[in-house]
């Protein structure tokens, strides 16, 4: 998802309400999803225009991890690497309705240039596939990456942005809280995430601001899923060390500090980083723009955080 200083979810919601009022659209959720996809694609096309894969990164692409066409992943690693590498699993954002590995390939290859094997995967999208499809896909990826020769299974890291941060956080909570995994209905593999990074994250759903997003994502009212979507109530002291990133132009900036405060309160190592200032206000998920010097600095900071937690 491209950098955005305005809230594209609200923009899509306004367009949705206007169009729905004409009576031309009976399925308001599909209308919302299509509008979000149009807005995000336009911005991503601008961000990535002219980019080509770097020569110093090896790409193994379109590896199936399931039977649905969307269930595919790429793995990237530095050219010349001869053995298993610390690995980053990237969980893309997009409001649960948009995004795939192609949209995140240049960002993920830039992480590989920093000395990691990087797993860049697509997952099934809402509203065509409701929760917990996205979480199930993440679990399937984690189950199959042990068979990839370039991945050091003793040094796994996870990064997610926006809605992908919600999924990454939820999955890390399930890995470290067996009761929560049972509530979610997933059986996690015996893996350890050494550290994680959450970028411009959506951690908890706001019943008002996120109403339409939740309606697309969940197969029922948000209140019916409170036990499953309550990340704050299911994170334990065993949660991985976390790098929490936001920016002065991020429309989700207000969500970061309460999350960091929660982790601190329960004894989980964490760092909260706010990039930019009042004059330079980088937008939502600015770090995905590999041409942005501040985005590069953020990604450097996160990779250093990961390397400090290798074993």
Region locations from a protein language model:
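Alpha/beta-hydrolase superfamily serine-hydrolase fold, recognizing
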Residues: 2-311
């Amino acid at each position: 998802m491209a950098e955005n200083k305005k809230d594209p979810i609200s923009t899509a919601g306004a367009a949705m309400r206007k169009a729905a009022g004409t009576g031309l659209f009976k399925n308001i959720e599909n209308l919302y999803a299509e509008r979000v996809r149009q807005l995000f694609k336009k911005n991503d096309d601008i961000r990535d225009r002219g980019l080509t894969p770097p020569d110093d990164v090896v790409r193994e692409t379109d590896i199936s991890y399931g039977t649905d066409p969307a269930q595919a992943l790429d793995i990237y690693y530095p050219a010349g690497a001869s053995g298993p590498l610390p690995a980053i699993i990237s969980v893309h954002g997009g409001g649960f309705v948009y995004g795939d590995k192609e949209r995140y390939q240049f960002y993920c290859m830039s992480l590989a240039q920093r000395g990691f094997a990087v797993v860049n995967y697509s997952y099934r999208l809402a509203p065509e596939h409701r929760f917990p499809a996205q979480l199930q896909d993440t679990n399937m990826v984690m189950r199959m990456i042990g068979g990839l020769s370039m991945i050091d299974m003793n040094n796994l890291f996870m990064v997610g942005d926006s809605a992908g941060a919600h999924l990454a956080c939820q999955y890390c909570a399930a890995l470290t809280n067996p009761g929560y995994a049972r509530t979610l209905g997933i059986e996690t593999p015996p893996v350890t995430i050494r550290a994680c990074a959450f970028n411009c994250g959506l951690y908890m759903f706001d019943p008002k601001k996120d109403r339409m997003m939740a309606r697309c994502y969940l197969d029922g009212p948000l209140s019916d899923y409170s036990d499953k979507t309550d990340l704050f109530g299911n994170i334990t002291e065993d949660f991985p060390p976390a790098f929490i990133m936001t920016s002065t132009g991020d429309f989700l900036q207000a969500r970061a500090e309460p999350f960091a405060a929660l982790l601190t309160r329960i004894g989980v190592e964490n760092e909260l980083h706010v990039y930019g200032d009042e004059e330079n206000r980088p937008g939502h998920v600015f770090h995905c723009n590999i041409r942005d010097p501040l985005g590069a600095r953020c990604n450097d900071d996160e990779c250093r955080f990961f390397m400090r937690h290798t074993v």
